Amino acid sequence: MIMVPIKEALTFDDVTLAPKYSEILPSEVNTSINLTKNLKLKIPLLSSAMDTVTESNMAIAIGKAGGIGVIHRNLDIQKQILEIKKVKKQKLLVGAAVGASIAEFDRAKAILK
């Protein structure tokens, strides 16, 4: 694979979206995506599974907006499950981060119970 150097990169601070007239009504816009064959989101947003980003509060907020929050794994298993339950109590979709070790397989099994 040939790596081509990036000549220009932009961040959010480098771009401004200027509103303009449009014939399209907000009620006519569909931002939904099929994340998987059986999982559709109203908005194409998944929160990052980082300890400074997603616990139950963020997962609930993004879930209410139509996306999905992914609870990070930098918690002990029971605390991660508690965060997941807080989101599920709101009847929202939620994801959970797990690693690839045997211990993380046990984490995944505990989360799925």
Task: Locate each region found by the language model.
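An N-cap/entry alpha-helix motif that binds or orients negatively charged groups
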Residues: 1-45
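Alpha/beta enzyme core
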Residues: 2-5, 15, 53-113
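Extracellular/luminal Protease-associated
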Residues: 44-52
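Acidic/glycine-rich phosphate/pyrophosphate-binding loops and surrounding catalytic core
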Residues: 34, 50, 61
